[in-house]
Amino acid sequence: MIIDCHTHLSFPGYEIRSEDHFVAAEPLDACFVLASPDQPSRQSNQLVSEYVARHPKKMLGFAIVNPVIDDISVRYWSGIKDTGFVGAVLYCGSEGFHPTHSKALQFYEVADRLHLPLFFHTVPPFGPDSVLEYIRPFLLDEIAQKFKNIKIIIGSMGLPFVNEAIYMVARHENVFGDLTVHPQKVWEVYNTVLAAHEAGVLGKLFFGSGLPVQKPQSCIETLLGFNKLLADTNLPTVPREKIREIIERPTLEILGITH
């Protein structure tokens, strides 16, 4: 199975019609649809919920939460889970809250109780109220230690703090990396994959496209093909079968998501 762990229906600066999102996801067996911070959380979650309900066999929703201002009660999040959401996505940097804020820690207790995996989204665009420091993967260390049963995904390998993300993935059994691929940034992809391979954590990375920013098919082709670009160089390569394993990883099983 091919699971895309990183897609959106909308994102600041990008939009895609739901029917176009579904067409772009054709090469995939399933994909995560992350609610976006470009509108209030309830509206964004409603948009994703309606889309997921139309395609329950393929689309899996991650509800956005800003624990500082949103409802983080068990009752509310039990209801969220009942509407087709399988996890939560947090935009600590762009929404300006520390990942270990006291309200955030309260939310993690709820997520732990409801068995919700957490996706920490890291990439720009960042607005004037964003705090770049809050996307640093090292800040998740306390969370991963305290809530060992929560599966944590570091979005986009923690860019621009990739090395921190790799250390976190290596350090914690319950922490994983989202390898969102940029076909126009092959060198960036190469360095990230090679660093993860050399650190022995390639087996804990999940494939992501970042749709609508990139199309899944282009991302798959980029991953499978970048070794060819290095054929006439002396640069180290990563075994093709290891790269294919990223694309075909049983992400749902690893995260404990029933689908």
Residue ranges and their predicted role:
Residues 6, 48, 52, 80, ...:
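Conserved, mostly hydrophobic/aromatic
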